[in-house]
A protein has these predicted regions:
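Interaction-mediating elements
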Residues: 1-114
């Protein structure tokens, strides 16, 4: 039996996460729900739907971090999940680095080149 699981992450900024997801053409949906086995649902701040229809979402934790929400039993069968999560994390980190750099270098023009 599969069910939705909530995993802690180091991500904290929802806007940076949404920007990273959009940059990867993952079409984030704000204020959504992730649906798991037998209709089990968890509200999330943002969700994406993968090509096979499975969902990943992120919800705010009490400590301010964004926890990953998904049906891990089903998602663990996907061989592309670890690389995808790595891409999302790298895109988030790049946006965070640009934001921090622009805060320390007012007037500088900074862009991401991939």
């Amino acid at each position: 039996m599969s069910h939705l699981a909530i995993l802690p992450t180091v991500l904290r900024d929802l806007e940076l996460l949404v920007g990273a997801l959009e940059g990867l053409d993952l079409q984030p949906e704000r204020d959504s729900r992730v649906i798991g086995f037998a209709g089990e649902a968890q509200p999330v701040a943002v969700a994406i739907r993968l090509q096979d229809g499975q969902q990943l979402g992120w919800r705010r934790q009490q400590d301010g971090s964004l926890a990953l929400v998904g049906d891990l039993s089903r998602l663990s069968r996907r061989h592309d999940l670890p690389p995808l999560l790595g891409e999302i994390t790298r895109a988030y980190a790049a946006r965070l680095a640009l934001r921090e750099a622009s805060a320390h270098l007012p007037g500088a023009e900074l862009t991401v080149v991939s």
